[in-house]
Design a protein with these regions (language model features):
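Acidic/His-rich active-site region of diverse nucleotide-sugar glycosyltransferases
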Residues: 1-51
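A structural signal for well-ordered alpha-helical scaffolds and beta->alpha junctions
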Residues: 3, 15-16, 108, 112, ...
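Extended, non-globular alpha-helical segments
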Residues: 21-42, 94-133, 158
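A short, conserved alpha-helix in the catalytic core of glycosyltransferases
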Residues: 38-39, 44-50, 55-82
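Short glycine-enriched, charge-decorated loop/helix-capping segments at active-site entrances
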Residues: 55, 99-102, 147
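Short glycine/serine- and small hydrophobic-enriched flexible loop segments
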Residues: 68-71, 117-120, 143
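Active-site donor/metal-binding and catalytic loop motifs
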Residues: 79-99
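Non-catalytic, C-terminal membrane-associated alpha-helical segments of glycosyltransferases
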Residues: 121-174
Length: 174
């Protein structure tokens, strides 16, 4: 069983993604996005911003909604005292003495496809796109080089990239 680890709240400023520290901040922080399963969203906010995109299927659903809400002038806040137990990823892979979170090749398809779909949106801030894209390239490059089955990861990542460019949504093709 993996060790319990706190995921930080993050905020992109300029070309930096900063992990926000609850121990040195107030109890509530303005953030880029939150995990959807841990969100409390008033119904009137859903009416104003719209629902979360079901066509994304999985991955970036919450990020897209939070960025859209922020674009429309509604800040997104993380509450430092809130706790959500949530397992992310599959079994970690060890590399150079450290453990790294992994996902299946299928999950990487959605991650890349939905990221590319989000980068195509004109209302997503350019600095956020640049920071996210650079992190995505590093993360997916790592999985292609280190996480077995490497060729399946490469194929699904490439397919996700192409489908994102083509604007395809919904469930992944088999």
């Amino acid at each position: 069983r993996r060790a319990q680890k706190k995921s930080p709240f993050v905020r992109t400023t300029g070309l930096r993604r900063t992990r926000l520290d609850c121990s040195t901040s107030g109890p509530v922080l303005e953030v880029d996005h939150l995990i959807a399963s841990g969100c409390l969203i008033p119904m009137d906010m859903l009416a104003r911003v719209g629902r979360m995109r079901e066509d994304f299927f999985i991955d970036f659903v919450d990020v897209e909604w939070c960025l859209r809400a922020r674009f429309e002038g509604h800040p997104v806040y993380g509450v430092c005292t809130a706790r959500l137990e949530h397992r992310l990823g599959d079994e970690p892979v060890k590399f150079l003495g450290r453990e790294y979170l992994t996902h299946s090749p299928r999950r990487h398809y959605f991650h890349v496809r939905n990221a590319v779909l989000l980068y195509r949106e004109p209302w997503v801030p350019l600095n956020w796109k640049l920071v996210s894209a650079s992190r995505l390239v590093l993360k997916m490059g790592f999985h292609v080089l280190v996480t077995p089955p490497r060729l399946q990861h490469l194929a699904r990542i490439a397919s996700g990239f192409l489908h994102g460019l083509l604007g395809r949504t919904g469930a992944a093709p088999d």
